[in-house]
């Protein structure tokens, strides 16, 4: 897994009228917010140790899951669910399937996790004996504390039922700026509702138009424009086709490595 990165969290003041106005522009969603999906069958294993420290980093690019607010309720998704990183940030409610393995299930409990990593295939092992994340299997390799909420430790792997659910977050979206001149790499975290981002655009305070950003990997988006020193605005569309505009959420004079918090959130 990628090493965890330390980020400086810079909270923007929201008391002034100008800042309040800067973070209230929205675009009417073309689709309603998605309801929880139907329950589906899968399997789940665990990794990362009892404190989930081994889950830090990962293919979604969140880095330190503790400091980013994802904690120990996270999981790596198999190819069938990961969608080349487009599923990063999505939330799933998972229960052990007592109909298939009552002896390994803790009754009457569910756990909700966030997709933060990718569980790669292991083509050296059969899909039903070690190659748990091989396509086309839907599989969750969960942080151990989350897995132990629903399964008996000695089982190692359990059948589960799962449904995708809206993510619940406190506060607004956060934007971490990394990279260098002519390459801004923006990590978007703390995304509620759909949890995952479909598209993203950026506008500098000295530019006239929105410029599309590209998914670099996981929840990281990049722009190749020269925007150093400019205030930055973002137009973000989630996978439920809701759009929010974060006007001047990053002030002029920002530095690479800083994180900027907005008060806007998907609902």
UniProtKB/Swiss-Prot annotation:
CDD domains: DPBB_EXPA_N. One of its GO terms (cellular component) is membrane. It is a peripheral membrane protein. The keyword Oxidoreductase does not apply. Residues 57-172 form the Expansin-like EG45 domain. It is found in: Secreted, Cell wall; Membrane. Residues 1-21 form the signal peptide. Keywords: Cell wall, Cell wall biogenesis/degradation, Membrane, Secreted, Signal. May cause loosening and extension of plant cell walls by disrupting non-covalent bonding between cellulose microfibrils and matrix glucans. No enzymatic activity has been found. May be required for rapid internodal elongation in deepwater rice during submergence. PANTHER family: EXPANSIN-A15. PROSITE patterns: EXPANSIN_CBD (PS50843), EXPANSIN_EG45 (PS50842). Residues 182-262 form the Expansin-like CBD domain. Transmembrane segments: none annotated. One of its GO terms (biological process) is plant-type cell wall loosening. Disulfide bonds: none annotated. SMART domains: DPBB_1. This is Expansin-A23. It comes from Oryza sativa subsp. japonica (Rice). Belongs to the expansin family. Expansin A subfamily.
């Amino acid at each position: 897994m990628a090493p965890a990165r330390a980020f400086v969290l810079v909270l923007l003041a929201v008391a002034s009228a100008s800042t309040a106005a800067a973070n209230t522009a929205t675009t009417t969603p073309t689709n309603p917010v998605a309801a929880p999906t139907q329950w589906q069958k899968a399997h789940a294993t665990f990794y990362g140790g009892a404190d989930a420290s081994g889950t830090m980093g990962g293919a979604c690019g969140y880095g330190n899951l503790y400091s980013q607010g994802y904690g120990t309720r996270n999981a790596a998704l198999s190819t069938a669910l990961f969608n080349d990183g487009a599923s990063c940030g999505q939330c799933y409610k998972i229960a052990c399937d007592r109909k298939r393995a009552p002896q390994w299930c803790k009754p009457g409990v569910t756990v909700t996790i966030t997709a933060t990593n990718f569980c790669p295939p292991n083509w050296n092992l059969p899909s039903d004996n070690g190659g748990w994340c091989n396509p086309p299997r839907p599989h969750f390799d969960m942080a151990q504390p989350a897995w132990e909420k629903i399964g008996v430790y000695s089982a190692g792997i359990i059948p589960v039922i799962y449904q995708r659910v809206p993510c619940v977050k406190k506060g607004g979206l956060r934007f971490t700026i990394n990279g260098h001149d002519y390459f801004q790499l923006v990590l978007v975290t703390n995304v509620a509702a759909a949890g995952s981002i479909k598209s993203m655009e950026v506008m500098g305070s000295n530019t006239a138009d929105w410029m599309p950003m590209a998914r670099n990997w996981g929840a990281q988006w990049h722009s190749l424009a020269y925007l150093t020193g400019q205030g930055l605005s973002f137009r973000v569309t989630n996978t439920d086709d809701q759009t929010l505009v974060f006007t001047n959420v990053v002030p002029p004079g920002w530095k690479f490595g800083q994180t900027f918090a907005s008060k806007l959130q998907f609902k």
